[in-house]
Design a protein with these regions (language model features):
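Surface-exposed interaction regions that form or flank ligand-binding interfaces
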Residues: 1-85, 96, 125-241
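Short, basic/glycine-rich phosphate-binding loops at helix/coil junctions
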Residues: 36-38, 115-122
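Catalytic metal-binding acidic patch
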Residues: 86-92
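Active-site beta-strand-loop-beta-strand hairpin of nuclease catalytic cores
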Residues: 92-117
Length: 241
């Protein structure tokens, strides 16, 4: 009988701890910039690896990036071809624009900055995926053109962030000026780059750029559908390598 009491008390303690942890996580989410900008429910974000990865990365940046900044999530930037490309996170800083491609993977990642495809390695499984540096170069190019049409010619930095589920990140970055890191080091890496940059935007200009990009986060359904199909086609091609 005493053993059963101990087991029940232990189970109750674990459930109580889990409830308190979840309540704390939900409170933190409600106060986050990600929730304020996207309006997404915590449960939806929690159940979607891509959204959860973007949220975890944005938390690090929100807490630790120095200087004035705005965040825009999931903007659909028009392409010259007539389609669009979706950015994960754009940070509008008083010193420039940081275009952040977020990957929420586990296991190992191997690659080279100048190779078209990289490897994602899990126990007993390997797959190839499109080089996120190349992917983000496209985002930067289209974003530069969009802002240029509004008279803004700003320094832009490409940032590739893997969430901390990646235990080993073995990528040779020779020849690339992009920032590549895990999410827990993203803020320190970006702050280091910011120290070498000069202020280019005042508060009013930052708000105007924010407004331009925020307007791109509410596309028609067929824009989202076209972007999803292009991503699926790219992943299918990578799977054949």
């Amino acid at each position: 009988m005493e053993t059963w009491k101990a087991v029940l008390l232990l189970a109750a303690g674990l459930l109580c701890g889990a409830w308190r942890w979840r309540s704390r996580e939900k409170r933190r989410y409600r106060r986050s910039v990600y929730r304020a900008e996207t309006g997404k429910q915590y449960k939806k974000v929690e159940e979607n690896r891509g959204m959860d990865g973007e949220y975890r990365t944005s938390l690090e940046l929100e807490k630790r990036i120095r200087g004035r900044r705005y965040f825009v999530f999931n903007a659909y930037i028009p392409c010259r071809s007539g389609g669009s490309t979706e950015t994960d996170i754009v940070m509008i800083h008083e010193k420039g624009i940081f275009v952040i491609e977020n990957k929420n993977y586990c296991g190992q990642v191997r690659g080279r900055a100048n190779r078209e495809y990289w490897e994602h390695i899990l126990p007993g499984k390997r797959r190839t995926f499109y080089n996120p540096i190349y992917q983000n170069q496209g985002h930067v190019r289209h974003l530069r053109r969009l802002l240029g049409e509004h008279g803004y010619h700003l320094p832009m930095v490409s940032v590739i962030v893997f969430n901390d589920g990646v235990k080993r990140l073995r990528v040779k970055m020779a020849g690339s000026d992009a920032i590549l890191c895990r999410s827990r080091r993203a803020a320190s890496k970006i702050n280091r780059r910011l120290r070498r940059m000069e202020q280019v935007l005042d508060e009013a200009e930052m708000e105007e750029v924010y407004g331009i990009l925020k307007a791109q986060t509410r596309p028609f359904w067929w824009v989202r559908y076209g972007q999803r199909k292009r991503a699926e086609k790219l992943q299918k091609k990578a799977g054949k390598i």
